[in-house]
Amino acid sequence: MIYAGILAGGIGSRMGNVPLPKQFLDIDNKPILIHTIEKFILVSEFNEIIIATPAQWISHTQDILKKYNITDQRVKVVAGGTDRNETIMNIIDHIRNVNGINNNDVIVTHDAVRPFLTQRIIKENIEVAAKYGAVDTVIEAIDTIVMSKDKQNIHSIPVRNEMYQGQTPQSFNIKLLQDSYRALSSEQKEILSDACKIIVESGHAVKLVRGELYNIKVTTPYDLKVANAIIQGDIADD
């Protein structure tokens, strides 16, 4: 089976003084989360579309689903965890409790605050994860990347044409991700905040799918302005 895991567990501290977590803020008079869910509903391959949100915001999430007529029975809401990976594991726990987990099951995980992903990106994630077990969505780095260990001096400059910027979705064979996560120590779980990094550390290859420049993550007031400009300018592909 194929599952979507929409990660809406953040509280949006970088957004500044706002009344709601960032995933519930509006762009073009509609919550960011709803824009994102609508993209996933269009994909018939998904057996379930699972939204993980802070426990105290579950009721609000359910309310906005009703308000914006999200009636697709595949859409479920569960409580997120204390960090990104724990949130993903909570989604997987839901899957295991409801349907069990089979060897070929795939989960497509995606930031709730990336509302501009395309159908191509989603479907390529499904195809590549089903074939290879793990995939990340990336774009080529445009700017030169510099590394600094002390935040004051450059310690190295990687070769730019080998650098990519990670986006989401990140998609996995569920058993591969679950087994890789369970093998981590408590210390590793605190350090390895990215699911693809966990897979890489386990020794398994992670394939790449091409993202889009406009597949932005809305985390700051500036991002919110850019997101509204993208919608009003009809920049993003469907």
UniProtKB/Swiss-Prot annotation:
- Catalytic activity, per the record? D-ribitol 5-phosphate + CTP + H(+) = CDP-L-ribitol + diphosphate
One Gene Ontology term of the molecular function aspect: 2-C-methyl-D-erythritol 4-phosphate cytidylyltransferase activity
Which EC number applies?
2.7.7.40
Enumerate the residues marked as the site Positions ribitol 5-phosphate for the nucleophilic attack. R160, K217
Provide this UniProt record's keywords sorted from A to Z. Cell wall biogenesis/degradation, Nucleotidyltransferase, Teichoic acid biosynthesis, Transferase
Gene3D superfamilies, A to Z:
Spore Coat Polysaccharide Biosynthesis Protein SpsA, Chain A (3.90.550.10)
Which residue numbers mark the site Transition state stabilizer?
R14, K22
Biological pathway: Cell wall biogenesis; poly(ribitol phosphate) teichoic acid biosynthesis
- What residues bind CTP, as annotated? L7, A8, G9, G10, G81, T82, D83, R84, N85, E86, T87
GO term, biological process aspect, one:
cell wall organization
List the NCBIfam families hit by this protein, alphabetically: PRK00155.1-3 (NF001183), PRK13385.1 (NF009924)
Report the sequence similarity comment from the record. Answer: Belongs to the IspD/TarI cytidylyltransferase family. TarI subfamily.
What PANTHER family would the database entry show? 2-C-METHYL-D-ERYTHRITOL 4-PHOSPHATE CYTIDYLYLTRANSFERASE, CHLOROPLASTIC (PTHR32125), RIBITOL-5-PHOSPHATE CYTIDYLYLTRANSFERASE (PTHR32125:SF8)
Provide the function of this protein.
Catalyzes the transfer of the cytidylyl group of CTP to D-ribitol 5-phosphate.
Q: What is this protein called?
A: Ribitol-5-phosphate cytidylyltransferase 2
Q: Which organism is it from?
A: Staphylococcus aureus (strain bovine RF122 / ET3-1)
Lineage at the top is: Bacteria, Bacillati, Bacillota, Bacilli, Bacillales
Q: What gene makes this protein? A: tarI2
